[in-house]
Each structure stands twice: as C-alpha cells, then as structure tokens.
Amino acid sequence: MINVNADPQEIAKFSELAHRWWDPDGEFRPLHQINPLRLDWIDRLAHLKGKHVLDVGCGGGILADAMARRGATVLGIDLAAKPLKVAKLHAMEAATASVEYREVAPEHLARELPSHFDVVTCMEMLEHVPDPSSIVQACAQLAKPGGWVFFSTFNRNPKSFLLAIVGAEHVLRLLPKGTHEYARFIKPSELAQWCRDSGLALESTRGMQYNPVTRRYWLSAETSVNYLLACRRPQ
C-alpha cells in the first residue's frame, strides 16, 4: 500500500467493515440513502453521460458504480485494499462495464494523469485524511480545464458535533461509533479557500439534512452539518 496522506487507523476502520459495504441495511446504510441525492446533484451540474470521471476515496464503489450507470466512464481510487476488492467484485456481479478501480493516492495519480478527467468527485473522504488540502489540490490537478470537481464533508461547529457525532453515532446509531473525529471536520470557508488556492472556481454549495422520524435526506441551503461543494477548473 502506498503510504501517502493516509491515516492507517482510518484505513483499518473501513477495511474491517468492507464486507458490509453493499448491504443497504448495514453500517453503510447512510451512504446508500444519500447516494441518489448526491448522484442527481452531480449529474445535474456536470451531465455525466459520456464523461470521464474520477471518484477519489471511492471505498466499496457506491457512488462510482452509480455514476457509471448514468453513462460515465469511471475510475475509482482508494488506499484501502479490502473495500476496493469489494468494489471490483460488485462491478463484476452487477455487470457494470464502465467502471474500474485502482489502489493509488490522488497525489500520485495527479502526476501520472494531470488534466485528465471531465469530472472529479471526492465525497465523505476529506475528513478522514491528515492533509485534506493536499487532496483538494490533487483533485484540481486531475480535472481538465473546464472540468467539474465535487466535494462533500462535515462542517465544524457545535451543531455538527451534536448531530453528526452524538446524534448519528451514539443516539440514532446511524453510523458505528468512532466513524468521525470532530477535530477533522472542515468549515465551508476553509474548503472554499483550499479550492481557490488550487485554482478552482466555486460554483455551488448545498447542505444535506436528515429527518430521523421519516428517515429521509434532502438537499437545502442549510450547510451547518453536512454540505456539498461544486467547483470548476477554469478553461
């Protein structure tokens, strides 16, 4: 495994649960529930059909597989070998022909394939690495001029601590305890600055909300907890 900008404990955490990745009622249920929302948002802005797409931190391939089914040619990358094996197996079983997976760091791939992708996605990943700004820079370098770059992560404030950690992990048990570290959450202003520093132009920001009674997620202008950010690399 390439040891670049990765936390071994984070890799071990998700590797341990890799066999559960495609269980819609398992530990990754929230990812399955939010996937249609983020997929539609990305597709609405970037028009995935016929595009060459990179999914950074793809894990078991939930988003990568869905984007391929929207007509994109997708490469999913991660540094956790076990989730990648699960992603490859699922692609084979589901006959998703236009998706491939590689164990490689985005910083390394940016040197190998600069300005290569029409769309780059990095969802629910930045809060799990030691240097998220380095990931943002690599994503910018991987996008073609005019290409789209998408991020999603958690805001850092008392409300996000209460809802995303206390509520989601300890009260509602939507996620395993220890899934997230509050200190690694990222304010939208911080992420936006990293994007600008990497030469990206901000296009759209949306929040993601959850109703524990109806168990329904939706996008809104409220970015105080989970949020998504869309950028473009200038032509």
Regions found by a protein language model. Give the residues of each.
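Conserved alpha-helix/loop element of class I SAM-dependent methyltransferases that forms part
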Residues: H32-K49
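A short acidic, Gly/Pro-enriched loop at the edge of an enzyme's catalytic core
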Residues: A110-V119
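Acceptor-substrate binding/catalytic loop of class I
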Residues: R173-E190
